[in-house]
Amino acid sequence: MIWRTILFAFATAAYADYDCHVSLWRGESLSFLLPDEACEVSGEAPGIEVQTGTLLPVRYLADNAALEYKTVADRAVYGSRAPGVHFATVMASRGADSGSYRFGNLVVTVVDRTLPPPKEWKYYLDLWQHPWAVARVNGCEPFSPSHYKAMEPLWRQLADAGQKTLTVTLVDRPWNKQCRDAYHSMVVRRKDAMGKWSFDYSRFDEYVVFGRACGIGPHISCYTMCPWEYVVDYEGPDGTTVKMVAKPGTAEFDDYWHDFLEDFERHLKEKGWLSDTYVAMDERSPEDLDYIAKFVRHVAPGLKISVAGNRPLSAFAGIDIDSYSHSFRRMDDQFIRDALLRKRQGLITTYYVCCEPPRPNTFMGSGAGEAFVCSFYPVVLNLDGFLRWAYNSWGEDPLRDMTYRRWASGDTALVYPDGSPSWRFLELKNGIQQAEKFCILHDMGARKDDLDELRRMFVLRDVQTGTDYARLRDKVIEILNKR
């Protein structure tokens, strides 16, 4: 088994007496590995909660070519006392008094600074959700009461990490057959014998209300006007399903999307959601994006445009994009300069990782600190946050095996169907909170020398090609938690 490198960056461990020391701000939730089974954690303190558990082993495909499988301690089960790798999560309320507190062998220091609630974080987190995967693993009818009940703890856990956008679908299979479970449309469309379109938004509305009640938002990312096969399904006059190819620039595209966008914009205005709604495209060609952006601006100017792009930003020059996420593999100094210009214009800019790069990433086989660096590094580059395509797009038996086809294991999910987070997700959340703290200190004009030191530690080419990510993580937490 691969054992996770012990995460005690923000801490020092006095192994002689097994005392463990961690520091955090008020309002922060910090997860870390316990250094030894002899590190007893017990006791209470006002405003501080400590939960412990075990990282249970999960199988994954480690080498596609050799079909070599391994196991890794990744599924974080709170309350478990099973043998193996143990961890703890410390939560300090915003009303907690600063100072040091002892919980058995664990010493927690609350720093006299406060992290606001996740809803107020400036950090822009966009992990794509997959409702139909939840329905399948729980044996539920999609969007039934039991389905919503199964989704709720997973969606609330994501909201607690600062998730800013709800993933919704305007067409069937926007990513074709990429996932184990198909995405379906949350909008029903019909075309009568006279060629008139009508739309039913009942499921869309219900799901948006649910997502916001879980704390996700305020943005709504609508996939997509450019599905991978350009197919739009609709119900014909006789009630049968018709598959129409509607490629940007064709009469079919213009006819359907014109009527839909006009009606959709009207509906969003009535619901009060228009200013929060984005038409989202994933890794589409500049030609398609240019046509769609101009089309949307003409027909439904109240809607925004969101793009994840795997080409140089210059390839999209002249295209009006409100929220842009750039492939981390293609990051360079020119993009960083362009992103700063976008920030000054009030536009959202993030980066994403997916099946690439090999590192840093959030795969089952990723090294210590990689997930943390993925989520923290954007603020060093003056970006707004981080995007990843799959929060919960599970394979066949994710509680036991995170393999999906021959993709890099872990690429498709950061949580488990029973609501357990992965260790990768907890490290990602640690990085997000440190990023928010970095931004708070920067906006206050505080600790400038320390923040400059952190910036100098991150060299783009080193981060892209491989470095000591655990050391970077450790130094970030040490500096940001100074008293």
Where are these regions (language model features)?
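Aromatic-lined carbohydrate-binding surfaces of glycoside hydrolases
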Residues: 79, 87-94, 100-299, 308-318, ...
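Short, hydrophobic beta-strand segments that form beta-sheet elements in well-ordered domains
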Residues: 34, 279, 304-309, 322-329
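Catalytic domains of carbohydrate-active enzymes that cleave complex glycans
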Residues: 231-233, 245-249, 253, 257-277, ...
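Beta-sheet-dominated interaction scaffolds and their linkers
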Residues: 14-33
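Catalytic-core region of carbohydrate-active enzymes that cleave or remodel glycosidic bonds
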Residues: 323-402, 406-407
